[in-house]
Amino acid sequence: MDSLTIKNGMLLSPANGFDGEKGDVLLRDGKIAEVGGCIEPQGEVIDATGCYVTPGFIDIHTHCYPAVPLGIDPDVLGIQRGTTTILDAGSAGADNFMDFYEGTIKHAKTKVFSMLNIAAEGLIRGHELNDMAKIDVDACKACVNAHRDVIVGLKARASASVVGDLGIKPIALAAETAHELGVPLMVHVGNYPPALGDVIDVLDHGDIITHTFHGKPGGVLNADGTPIEQAVRGRARGVRFDVGHGVESFAFETYKRALAAGFDCDSISTDLHVENYQGPVFDLATTVTKLIACGEPLADAITKVTSVPALFFGLDGLGQLAPGMTGDINVFRYDDVDVTLQDATCATVEVRHHVNVRKTIWSRGSQTHILEHPDTPWDPKAVSAEELAARIAEAKKEN
């Protein structure tokens, strides 16, 4: 459709001054044309009474390259789950990026950006950084420079099972390469070595630690619950700390302790892939719901899946309800519920409010589309403890 008017919603886009006040949004030719009070309807009309209206959600950590073992179709992880833009976190490297781009990215309804793996083969085989010969810096730079409209960062995994005996060496090279290219480096952290502090120390402004609140030994918190000194120094120079829930990388206890210590996340992401999109992660809205249950304010959580990731990766036209921005919008209810959700350690949290996406509005070119999500009572069907334990045991081999 060419025009769409969303009426009577609670506009929530804190980055540009909308904090839940009632208002309307007009979309025309794939862009937001007007935001504010009572707007004269044009084209199709959505009555958003009782719902929040936000910029389209952005998930900065997914795996949507189907050629790798963890990969799954981007639209399954994106618009079908209420997220209009996703970033693939290192599934492809310089050797296979063009296959990912031509075979998947170009055909997706969901907006897809890539963080190129510093390892040339990406995540085709795992253990991708246990040999420096697996890194081709020149090919990496050439690939990024040829596709800067899609490749918005680099990715490296800093786990013992990935780097082997090389420790910090491949991560330091990834950071050096990203800094020379002028793009962020996202680093997966998990079981050490290398030590988390050593990883943070090679990062600079704009780089991102994902899986920050994993709960494994050697994590972001000291025994007394305070953040480690390297994390404090890193944040001071602009290193960002992301959630990256995943199948083994988010613990309610760790996050709550960090929140109490004043060390909140900078961004919220899922690490969605084939092993967790049916639980315990499900989707970005569910991950947001979990953080809210742990104490994150709604407005802050929405900012961390809209304007913040857009700023981190320079995603022009995304992340705000403002004239001229791309017409990607979420309409969600903030339902009162009484359910229990699991983290990646089988621990649970009582959920009282659910971010329940009702409509995902996405625009490509001059056309705007609406995906309505089933209006059924929310039932997350948490994965059984036995099944989750089996998944975690398998994930430990790679994390």
Q: What does each model-found stretch correspond to?
A:
Residues 1-40:
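N-terminal metal-binding scaffold of metallo-dependent hydrolase/deaminase domains
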Residues 9, 25, 30, 50, ...:
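Divalent metal-coordination and catalytic microenvironments
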Residues 38-53:
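Active-site metal-binding motif and surrounding structural segment of the metallo-beta-lactamase
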Residues 51-73:
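Di-metal (Zn2+ and/or Mg2+/Mn2+) metal-binding site signature of metallo-dependent hydrolases
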Residues 76-159:
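Divalent-metal coordination cores built from histidine and acidic residues
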Residues 156-278:
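Active-site core of metal-dependent hydrolases
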Residues 253-334:
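His/Asp/Glu-enriched, well-ordered alpha-helical/loop segment
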Residues 326-379:
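C-terminal cap of metal-dependent C-N hydrolases
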